[in-house]
Amino acid sequence: MGSAPDNDSTPLDGDFEREVYEALKLWKIPGIAIAVIDEESTWTEGYGIADLASSTKVEANTLFYGGSTTKAFTAALMSMLVEDNDRYPHVQWSTPVCELIRDDFVLGHPGRTADTTIEDILSHRTGMPGHDFSMGSVHAGQQATVQDVVRSLRFLPAAAPPRTTYIYNNAMYIVASHLIQTVTGEELRSLFQRYIWDPLGMSHTYLRLKDAVAGQEPLAKGYADESATDDDPQYEEVPWKDRPEISGAGAIISSVGDYAKWVHALMNPEASSSSSSSSDSTATTSLSAAICADVGTARTLIPPPSEPFLTPMAYCLGWNRYVYRGVEILTHDGGIDGFGAEIAMIPALKYGVVTMANSTYTSNFGGTCLVYKLIDDKLGIPAEDRYDWTQKYTDLVAQMDAYNANAVSYFYPTLPDPPRPGPTLPLAAYAGLYWHDGYGALELVLDAADGKLHATRTQAQYTTACALTFEHISGDFFTATVAVVGAQTVVPAEFALSPAGVPRAIGIGWEPHLGTEKRTWMRRVGADEAGRLLRGDQSHPHHAEAYVSYQREEAQLPEFLTSHLFV
């Protein structure tokens, strides 16, 4: 079911509906909601199933997680602070982040800490990789906060100098969330509500799961396809995420109807700033033309150029920007376990498309295909000249499968022939608890059934839950298959032994941006120390202290013995 203006020119017609259901079948997506904004007209429609157990259908007002589409709201709110020189003159794009949250924002080197600006963290040019597996949902036995995530960055390495390359980083938008809350003294969701959602009439948009569940509109269930073939899907329900620590990086829950109001406002900023669709007469939005232009201005080049775009993509502030078929487009996607969202808008034509769906990863594949079907329709692109988005994502899935299948040769191109027959010690000797101050705990267990080492990081403990299965390759070198919801990847792993022949550390290639040779070294800890660390009894050195500690440990100890040194 859906809603539309009273005219016959709907782009969501019967022909398009057939394409939607073909996409749902191909990409194994239970359901999807779509909105189209064309100047002053908006059409919304739901297709498929929101809840398989109850056979509840997707409606135009069904709620979905929006994932990283949250970032555009965070960037817009930050831009409002930058523009408000009366109350926040100390908040400018060039302001170093450490000047505003000095005790919390510390990177691995004092120069990097001092040099990283607000603009840098919002445009993915800090040189820091994502380190997504490092984020814990629990800190010292309590629900992790944005401050906890920010304070963990001091233990994580950079991949490039600042402002030299684009590296997408969720954690930096968590930094932005913490900065905004610290400067204003208010929760991010309250600020979103007052300055964006209420003025635009976005009455079904939330930043907390409990608020969405308590609302009037149904929240779709998320799913992952667990079938091993391309045949009928075997959907497994994915629990709703309650992750306040991801905040302005990806916690939003909304509907395509509300997002249509957001997209319309971004393309018509003066209208949105001079009037409000909220019944609250005190609700005003600061979404000015200057702010909309600011967040949509290219800041960081995203290499390399990619077909079918005419120009290299660039990252703005919460948006990607590029030229497609002769028009400039702003886009962003969002993905979170069980859900995926796509937003695209052509400001010059005041045309936008939003999709929200309830499958892991494939929501974005299918959503993108449908977004560009609608854009091509709007631009009048002949069928024979249209780019094959379905083939693009089919090839991408094949590339991911090939990468996993050939991981051993990729990570270990100089293996001896034949490989060394076994690790130095019996596998049981490597089992135990390992710790890294940024990545937390990893407990290795030997499974008697398959004779392999395994580790599990649950959703109750970590923002990104995963299960690791270790395969011996040669000597003390392994690969680890890292299974997450709806997908898996392979990373290198190796053990370091003490002179006495005791396992002292495990090095894992958690972060691909650091290169194939670098490992995150997690040191082995005993039960007493593990308990202390899990209670949060560890120091959080300022950058100067961290730098001295780094240099001292590097000079005096083997690198694998340090808790925050990466090699």
UniProtKB/Swiss-Prot annotation:
UniProt keyword terms in alphabetical order: Hydrolase
Gene null: resulting phenotype: Does not affect the production of unguisin A and B.
GO-annotated molecular function: hydrolase activity
EC number: 3.4.-.-
Enzyme class of the recorded protein, top EC level: hydrolase
Pfam families per the UniProt record, alphabetical: Beta-lactamase, DUF3471
Family annotation (InterPro entries): Bact_CellWall_Synth/Modif (IPR050491), Beta-lactam-related (IPR001466), Beta-lactam/transpept-like (IPR012338), Peptidase_S12_Pab87-rel_C (IPR021860)
Domain of life: Eukaryota
Record carries keyword Hydrolase: yes
This protein's pathway: Secondary metabolite biosynthesis
Family statement drawn from the similarity comment of this UniProt entry: Belongs to the peptidase S12 family.
Function (record text): Hydrolase; part of the gene cluster that mediates the biosynthesis of the unguisins, gamma-aminobutyric acid (GABA)-containing fungal cyclic heptapeptides with the amino acid sequence cyclo-(D-Ala1-D-Val2-L-Phe3-D-Val4-D-Ala5-D-Trp6-GABA7) for unguisin A and cyclo-(D-Ala1-D-Val2-L-Leu3-D-Val4-D-Ala5-D-Trp6-GABA7) for unguisin B. Within the pathway, the hydrolase ungD catalyzes the hydrolysis between the D-tryptophan and GABA residues of unguisins A and B to produce the corresponding linear peptides.
Record-given protein name: Unguisins hydrolase ungD
